[in-house]
Amino acid sequence: MTDQSPAPTAQDENRLIAERRAKLARLRETGVAFPNNFVPDAHAADLHARYDGLDQEALTAAAVTVKVAGRMMLKRVMGKASFATLQDGSGRIQIYLERGTLGEEAYAAFKQWDIGDIIAIEGPVFKTNKGELSVHANSARLLSKSLRPLPDKFHGVADQELRYRQRYVDLIMTDATRRTFEARSKAVGGIRQAMLNAGFLEVETPMLHPIPGGAAAKPFVTHHNALDMQMFLRIAPELYLKRLIVGGFERVFEINRNFRNEGVSPRHNPEFTMMEFYAAYADYRWLMDFTEDLIRQAAIAATGSAVLSYQDRELDLSQPFDRLTICEAILKYAEGYTQAQLDDPAFVRAELRKLGANVEGPPLARAGLGALQLALFEETAEAKLWRPTYIIDYPVEVSPLARASDTRDGITERFELFITGREIANGFSELNDPEDQAERFRAQVEAKDAGDEEAMYFDADYIRALEYGMPPTGGCGIGIDRLVMLLTDSPSIRDVILFPHLRRED
């Protein structure tokens, strides 16, 4: 036996909606169905912080009267007196209402209100006999009628897709969801403040690009009617931010959206938030140190600590991050390989074929040894990088915007940061040689012509900017959504995006 009632059916919900619409119709007849002349002067969390520690005698002596407003989440009518729970943006507070104080008419009106209604209460703060901090209603008003019943407290929003699709209901019902997005805001705020403290200038660059660039990705395409030209939602702000370095801003950053017309998964949303920053006279080693500290600051801002728990495993961001080359990571995390094998293109290609990779199609069909090693790393080692780890020294052929190493042929001064097996950041010493950059763009165009949809276009204006001279520069992009997943112990990227992309409802 159980005392939990079954979840309401669609027929029950339709009946409740009809009843609530009838109540709203009666309110409209009074001429004030949705009043807008009440301003609260207190929030639930503030009341608990100030008065939870006081006893009733002290509260009576303080004689504190407050005005609160929010959504009614619980209602218990007990004859001449009732209790309700009011939920505002900060938390919950109990409300006590009695007929003798409110009067017959106002108390009768309250009894007709429904769970989910937005209400306004004015009265003194007190404690019940059980010690519950409450507001004793001297007046009570209905501010906004809720026509749709909320999920009941026991069943909540059980359908995960419904939580994403109707995030407003999820936020009403689920404390953990609200905490996730509050933590996200704190993390972004912490990053922004750290960047400003380090002397970076926050900028905004175009969201519509005439040429997609700055990343290897498939763009969304649109048309600019006034200019009669094809445009692309930006896949990255990189080339515009580096134009600003050319223009004389020595440290810039941007926190904004990128758009990539690719798959949806627990790690990917086609619309996502990135923080990209560029610093003149910095290289990739400086970037790694700076990024490491920045992520710690974000963790502390969001959670109060740099030591976290993610999916029931400890995640320690307080210690120095590991740094491994692609081959070192394969040798450490994938079993059975030798350096000699990894240096043999035929062997690596055969291994990739065994693992199910399409080595005959783009981009691997034309790949050199470095790109093949990277593909093997992605197949065998990437998911095992639980500890924060920088993978460094990426091959030139997969790093068209990164500066080449002065000491190793075919290698760039580039890193990617992995935490819990996910890429969190990508950075490098920037290529500032315009002739080298033009040649790499041409190689990307050849790859695109050969069928690689994610290869870059040739951006002549960016080359022109480099020809004016760009100082030695380092730049990095941090995936805000994936970082927030770590900081909030969220298994899916959809859990940290307020309104993730979903298929249309039937």
Curated annotation (Swiss-Prot):
Pfam families: tRNA-synt_2, tRNA_anti-codon
Required cofactor(s): Mg(2+)
Binding, Mg(2+) 1: E416, E423
Cofactor note: Binds 3 Mg(2+) ions per subunit.
UniProt binding sites for Mg(2+) 2: E423
Gene Ontology molecular-function annotations: ATP binding; lysine-tRNA ligase activity; magnesium ion binding; tRNA binding
Keywords from the named record: Aminoacyl-tRNA synthetase, ATP-binding, Cytoplasm, Ligase, Magnesium, Metal-binding, Nucleotide-binding, Protein biosynthesis
Known EC number: 6.1.1.6
InterPro entries the record matches: Aa-tRNA-synt_II, aa-tRNA-synth_II, aa-tRNA-synth_II/BPL/LPL, Lys-tRNA-ligase_II, Lys-tRNA-ligase_II_N, Lys-tRNA-synth_II_C, NA-bd_OB-fold, NA-bd_OB_tRNA
GO CC annotation terms, alphabetical: cytosol
Reactions it catalyzes: tRNA(Lys) + L-lysine + ATP = L-lysyl-tRNA(Lys) + AMP + diphosphate
GO BP annotations listed: lysyl-tRNA aminoacylation
Record's subcellular location: Cytoplasm
Subunit and interaction comment: Homodimer.
Family, as annotated: Belongs to the class-II aminoacyl-tRNA synthetase family.
HAMAP family: Lys_tRNA_synth_class2 (MF_00252)
Protein name according to UniProt: Lysine--tRNA ligase
Organism: Bordetella pertussis (strain Tohama I / ATCC BAA-589 / NCTC 13251)
Gene name as annotated: lysS
